[in-house]
Amino acid sequence: SLERIADSLEKKAHNEVDDKVDVAVESSDDTNENENMDYGCSVKEIDVNILIDKLQEKNITVKTYVDSSHENTSLDNVAYFMGNRYNDIRKVYETIKRHLNKPNGFHLDLKNATQSEISASCQLCTTLYDIAFLSEYKYDKSPRYFIHATPNKIPIAINFLTGHWLEIFIRKTIQDSLKSLPAAIEYTYLINPQIILPNGNDFELDVVFLINGEIYWVEGKTGNYQHYINKYSHVANMLNLDKNHSFLVLTDVINPNTTYILSKTFDMTIIPVEEFEEEIKYVFHENLIP
C-alpha cells in the first residue's frame, strides 16, 4: 500500500539514498572491471588532440573545449541514476526544472504515483538536498503523499538541472559500456566543444567520442527537441556519420512509435534516455568487436 511505501521511505531516505545511487554505479563499475580482467582486454584513454585532428580532416575546426582532466566527475552517480530511472523521476524532475526560475518552492502530489516513482523521486530529492541543489526538501507520508521542495538558485545547480546532467549521463554510460567490451579499446572524448562547421557556421556539440578511430556523436535534449532535430540531422551529414555513429537522446518522448518515426525520418538514431545504455552497448558490440 502507499502508506507502507511512505513509512518505509520516510525511515530510510536519508540513510539509503546516496548508498543506493553510489552502490548501483559502483557495482556496475566493479562488474565492468571484472569483465575486462576476464577477457584480458584493455581500455585506454588517448590524447584528445587525435580527435581534434580527426574532426579537422572533416573540415570541422574545434575552437574551444574543456580538458577532460579538469572535468568535475563528482556528479556522475547522480546523473547516472537520473538517466536510468528517468521514467520514475520524470514528474519530480520536470517540476524542479520549472521552478528553477521561480521565487518559491513547490508541492508535488504523489498520491497516484507508483511505488517505483515514489521511491526514485524521494531518492533523487534527498540526494539533491544533501548536495545543496535543493535548499528545502520534505516528504509528507500518508495521507498526504506530498513532496515539498525548493530548488537552490546557484549556477552549478541550475546548469546541472537544466540539462548538463544528461551530458554527464551520456558520457559516463559510454565510458562504462566500453569497459564491458571483450576488445582492446582506445578512446578520447570532448564535452561541449565549440566548433566551426564546414559551411562556416558556429556550433556546439554535446558529447563526441573517438573510439578505435571512429567518431561517435551524441546530443541530449531535455525539451523542445522539435526546434533542433533537423539541424542536428544536417550536422550528422556534414560529419559523414551514419545512424550507428550519431544519436539524439531525448527525455520528453514517451511514445516508442514517436522515436521510431523520428529515426526513420531524420539521419540519426533518436532514442529515449532510459534506452540509451542498451542501444549504445548493442552498437559497440556490432562495431567494435572483431
Kindly label every feature range from the protein language model.
Residues S1-D19:
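Extended alpha-helical segments
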Residues K20-P290:
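Intrinsically disordered, low-complexity Ser/Thr/Pro/Gly-rich regulatory segments
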